[in-house]
């Protein structure tokens, strides 16, 4: 949004008006229909006091403007001004009385007799006053510290073979986007889920980066919380640093994720009869790690992906009704079309997977099949592309075998958005819009990337394209033969990433000793003595190299319905802000484990990933600088982890060895045996922009409007190379107000910016929406009260019915209910989950035999009374009914009489 100040010729007709006048008018009603707010409009014409309703009612404000030629009006809820004659929003440089200053607000340095107090506007009395942004909020580089006083140089004590955790935590701690989020937006680390890992991590980051710089701290609380969730890390045995990283980031994502509502437009080229597999947000998925495309790992992952464990205690399960399902389908259709339109191809959905298409050369007419893989479904959507050139198909022909993280995965999408996720809010389109539920967190914002992979059948030329979200790249370390193929430019030899396994060899204590000898000798002997040097670019090239699918690793073509020879490879569609690279040094077999100790050369600056970028990718920055590296010394069965990290405040490298922190040279880091590397996008332009905005904040001019902006987005602006469009939706509801649940800590969510800063940020990054006034949403408050009343009523009725059921001596009928669904319902009525569950789903506990529904043996089910079942079923619907009837034993009256006689005789004795 650009600024329209002094471009509206009707500003001269505005009369003098004070904030008290606007507040008084906002408490009134429309002068014609008597309807009350919100969203009343006040006429700004000189000596006109008219107040009318907006478009949500009869729109008397527009009628008043047409009849009286009074063109300027102000929304009494948002304080935004609209000119009917110019048909645009205008910004006032004068006319509104200067409001009094707000107390207890940070003030930046005053220059040219201008203070921050000139920019404040009155806040909602029910909300705490947000702080005004200062230079430190916009530019991390203003925190110039002396080298001897640099923060972040605090060690971590080893509390029982926990060097793997200490190295991982130090590596994450030196990732500025994540650490700065917890330091600047610590108020957002809120969760009702146990064991509240985000709060323990916040406390740890505060201690590590405190100005007092303690020598070392003990991460006991964080470690205890992780052990509670993941039993893998219990005990005192050595664990894997990368697995710990995955577990920690999964837990942080689960606790910090927020549901985001996006408006999606329905593509005009699609009809309602076309069906597409249901899609959910990729950020709700437990993050994946892109593994190398070896045949053995591919088979292992495919076999392991058929069934996933479910965390029924904490996981929010979203069961969509038919309308939600249609919205998800339409959303997915648009994502497919966005990708196809980028390839300049015509799109036509075909429901018949086995449609016979004429197969010709790739340079002429080609049929490409886009597979949308849903983990909860095996349905596949076929999208046929016509006139697709070879250059648009082959560069993305590689399938990636995802390796799931340590924590239980959730169902989710393999289709992150191909188009920019944030668009300027404009209502000019006449297309029907859909709402789509999406989840995001600071973890997904920082570490999520997208890989586009494809497999081509060499018989029918069908190409299967898949998009997958990754959190880290697991790269193979190529051997001598692989390096020769990679470095050969005379012939396009296909390099198989899986062949790197030949570099493994059994190791023992002798190898442990020889490793240190070799490390010393390597530094003294020329590299040609040991053979070719393996670089990180070689590992990336091996990962992204084309791979033949033949022999035991043939491709199962769905068009041919047979195993066929194929070729696969992949490219990156979207690079993350911080790229986590895992070098596959360990291989764990059934009887033994091995380790590759090959030195991999990696750059400290200027890692160029352009060769691995998809041609149609919108990515602009593909150069990365190293932040930290985790190293492992020893063998696969024993060893020690350390981390080398670059301090962001003084740009010096340090070795973090448990509680010991030592400055090291760059050459020491480059000679390290890297295991996990963290690279950050590099952008001089972003640093210049931060300095420019920071300088503007110190010399800002007075303005009458103050803008509120998300702290989370400001953290992105402060630490990201590509912060993306401004997003204020993290503190706004869908109605434009403050959600009642966030009202108590609104000061932790937003900062105030003067108008000139907002204009500069908005003109460069777009996004929004613009917010000039904070108020608690009345509509959300009513909905919240309704949902709380519903929770209370359902819980009370269930307790009463269940108590009556427990008092029955011998109930004739039991109704079985899925405990998975019941846990979701229990989380809802107890206030742990904001959304009610979907329909009752007993399909997992039911089995049909001889035409009747019976309880499946060993099913995770509970027993309730018929009255309780009818109560829940009347609210949520679903089924099927699973009824248990205890067998009735018929006793012969003569036998019963004889037993009673014996009992009487026994008592008489």
Curated annotation (Swiss-Prot):
Zn(2+) 2 binds at residues 30, 33, 53, 60. Ubiquitinated via a VHL-dependent pathway for proteasomal degradation. InterPro entries: DUSP-like_sf, Papain-like_cys_pep_sf, Pept_C19_DUSP, Peptidase_C19_UCH, Ub_carboxyl-term_hydrolase, USP_CS, USP_dom, Znf_RING/FYVE/PHD. It is an enzyme of class 3 (hydrolase). Keywords: Cytoplasm, Cytoskeleton, Endocytosis, Hydrolase, Metal-binding, Phosphoprotein, Protease, Repeat, Thiol protease, Ubl conjugation, Ubl conjugation pathway, Zinc, Zinc-finger. The active site is at 163 (nucleophile), 640 (proton acceptor). CDD domains: Peptidase_C19R. Zn(2+) 1 binds at residues 8, 10, 83, 86. Its EC number is 3.4.19.12. PROSITE patterns: DUSP (PS51283), USP_1 (PS00972), USP_2 (PS00973), USP_3 (PS50235), ZF_UBP (PS50271). Residues 421-436 have a biased composition (Basic residues). A zinc finger (UBP-type) spans 6-109. Present in 9.5 and 11.5 dpc commissural neurons (at protein level). It is found in: Cytoplasm, Perinuclear region; Cytoplasm, Cytoskeleton, Microtubule organizing center, Centrosome. It catalyses: Thiol-dependent hydrolysis of ester, thioester, amide, peptide and isopeptide bonds formed by the C-terminal Gly of ubiquitin (a 76-residue protein attached to proteins as an intracellular targeting signal). GO terms for biological process: axon guidance; cell migration; cellular response to starvation; centrosome duplication; endocytosis; protein deubiquitination; protein K48-linked deubiquitination; protein K63-linked deubiquitination. Zn(2+) 3 binds at residues 43, 48, 64, 70. Deubiquitinating enzyme involved in various processes such as centrosome duplication, cellular migration and beta-2 adrenergic receptor/ADRB2 recycling. Involved in regulation of centrosome duplication by mediating deubiquitination of CCP110 in S and G2/M phase, leading to stabilize CCP110 during the period which centrioles duplicate and elongate. Involved in cell migration via its interaction with intracellular domain of ROBO1, leading to regulate the Slit signaling. Interacts with VHL, leading to its ubiquitination and subsequent degradation. Interacts with ARRB1 and ARRB2. Interacts with ADRB2. Interacts with DIO2. Interacts with SELENBP1; in a selenium-dependent manner. Interacts with CCP110. Interacts with ROBO1. This is Ubiquitin carboxyl-terminal hydrolase 33. It comes from Mus musculus.
């Amino acid at each position: 949004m650009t600024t329209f100040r002094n471009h509206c010729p009707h500003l001269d007709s505005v009369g003098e008006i004070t904030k008290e006048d606007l507040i008084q008018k906002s408490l009134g009603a429309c002068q014609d229909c008597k309807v009350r707010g919100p969203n009343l409009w006040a006429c700004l014409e000189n000596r006109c006091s008219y107040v009318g309703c907006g478009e949500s009612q009869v729109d008397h404000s527009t009628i008043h403007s047409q009849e009286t030629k009074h063109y300027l009006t102000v929304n009494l809820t948002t304080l935004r001004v609209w000119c009917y004659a110019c048909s645009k929003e205008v910004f006032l440089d004068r006319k509104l009385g200067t409001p009094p200053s707000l107390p207890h607000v940070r003030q930046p340095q005053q220059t040219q007799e201008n203070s921050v107090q000139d920019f404040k506007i009155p806040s909602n009395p029910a909300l705490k006053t947000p702080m005004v942004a200062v230079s430190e909020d916009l530019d991390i580089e203003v925190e110039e510290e002396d080298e001897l006083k640099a923060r972040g140089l605090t060690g971590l004590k080893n509390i029982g073979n926990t060097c793997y955790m200490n190295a991982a935590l130090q590596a994450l701690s030196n990732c500025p986007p994540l650490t700065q989020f917890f330091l600047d937006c610590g108020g957002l680390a809120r969760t009702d889920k146990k064991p509240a890992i985000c709060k323990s991590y916040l406390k740890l980051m505060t201690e590590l980066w405190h100005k007092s710089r303690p020598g070392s701290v003990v991460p006991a609380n964080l470690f205890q919380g992780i052990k509670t969730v993941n039993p893998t890390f219990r005990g005192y045995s050595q664990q894997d640093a990368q697995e710990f990283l995955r577990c920690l980031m999964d837990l942080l994502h689960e606790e910090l994720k927020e549901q985001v509502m996006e408006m999606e437009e329905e593509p005009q080229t699609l009809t309602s009869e076309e069906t597409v597999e249901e899609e959910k947000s990729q950020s709700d998925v437990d993050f994946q790690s892109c593994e190398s495309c070896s045949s053995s790992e591919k088979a292992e992952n495919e076999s392991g992906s058929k069934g996933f464990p479910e965390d029924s205690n904490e996981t929010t399960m979203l069961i969509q009704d038919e309308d939600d399902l249609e919205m998800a389908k339409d959303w997915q259709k648009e994502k497919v079309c966005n990708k196809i339109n980028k390839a300049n191809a015509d799109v036509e959905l075909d429901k018949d997977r086995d449609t016979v298409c004429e197969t010709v050369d790739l340079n002429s007419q080609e049929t490409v099949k886009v597979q949308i893989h849903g983990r909860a479904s095996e349905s596949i959507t076929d999208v046929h592309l016509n006139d697709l050139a070879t250059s648009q198909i082959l560069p993305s022909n590689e399938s990636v075998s995802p390796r799931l993280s340590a924590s239980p995965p959730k169902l989710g999408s393999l289709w992150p958005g191909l188009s920019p996720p944030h668009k300027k809010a404009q209502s000019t389109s006449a297309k029907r819009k859909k709402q789509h539920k999406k989840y995001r967190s600071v973890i997904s914002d920082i570490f999520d990337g997208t890989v586009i992979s494809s497999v081509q059948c060499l018989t029918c030329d069908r190409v299967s394209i898949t998009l997958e979200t990754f959190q880290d790249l697991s790269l193979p370390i190529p051997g001598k033969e692989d390096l020769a193929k990679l470095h050969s430019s005379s012939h396009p030899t296909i390099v198989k990433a899986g062949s790197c396994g030949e570099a493994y060899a059994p190791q023992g204590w002798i190898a442990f000793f020889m490793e240190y000898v070799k490390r010393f000798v390597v530094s003294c002997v020329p590299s040609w003595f040991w053979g070719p040097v393996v670089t990180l670019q070689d590992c990336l090239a091996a990962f992204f190299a084309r791979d033949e699918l033949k022999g035991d690793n043939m491709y199962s073509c769905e068009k041919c319905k047979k195993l066929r020879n194929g070729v696969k490879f992949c490219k990156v569609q979207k690079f993350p802000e911080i790229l986590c690279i895992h070098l596959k040094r360990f291989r764990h077999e059934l009887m033994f484990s091995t380790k590759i100790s090959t030195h991999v050369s990696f750059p400290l600056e200027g890692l160029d990933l352009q060769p691995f970028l998809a041609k149609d990718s919108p990515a602009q920055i593909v150069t990365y600088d190293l932040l930290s590296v985790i190293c492992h010394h020893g063998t696969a069965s024993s060893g020690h982890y350390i981390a080398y990290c670059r301090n962001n405040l003084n740009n010096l490298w340090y070795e973090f060895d448990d509680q010991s922190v030592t400055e090291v040279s760059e050459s020491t880091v480059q000679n390290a045996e890297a295991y996990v590397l963290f690279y950050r996008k590099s952008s001089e332009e972003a640093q210049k922009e931060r300095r420019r905005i920071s300088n503007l904040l110190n010399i800002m001019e007075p303005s009458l409007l103050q803008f509120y902006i998300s702290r989370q987005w400001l953290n992105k602006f402060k630490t990201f190379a590509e912060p993306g469009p401004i997003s204020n939706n993290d503190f706004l509801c869908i109605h434009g107000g403050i959600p009642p649940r966030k009202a108590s800590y609104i000061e932790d969510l937003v900062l105030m910016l003067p108008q000139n800063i907002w204009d500069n940020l908005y003109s460069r990054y777009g996004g929004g929406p613009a917010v000039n006034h904070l108020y608690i949403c009345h509509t959300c408050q009513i909905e919240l009260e309704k949902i709380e009343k519903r929770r209370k009523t359902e819980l009370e009725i269930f307790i009463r019915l269940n108590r009556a059921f427990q008092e029955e001596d011998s109930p004739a009928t039991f109704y079985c209910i899925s405990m998975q669904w019941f846990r979701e319902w229990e989380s809802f009525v107890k206030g742990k989950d904001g959304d009610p569950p979907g329909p009752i789903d007993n399909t997992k506990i039911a089995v049909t035999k001889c035409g009747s529904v019976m309880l499946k043996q060993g099913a995770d089910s509970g027993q309730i009374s018929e009255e309780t079942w009818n109560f829940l079923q009347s609210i949520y619907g679903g089924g099927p009914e699973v009824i248990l009837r205890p067998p009735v034993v018929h006793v012969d009256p003569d036998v019963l009489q004889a037993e009673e006689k014996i009992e009487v005789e026994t008592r008489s004795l």
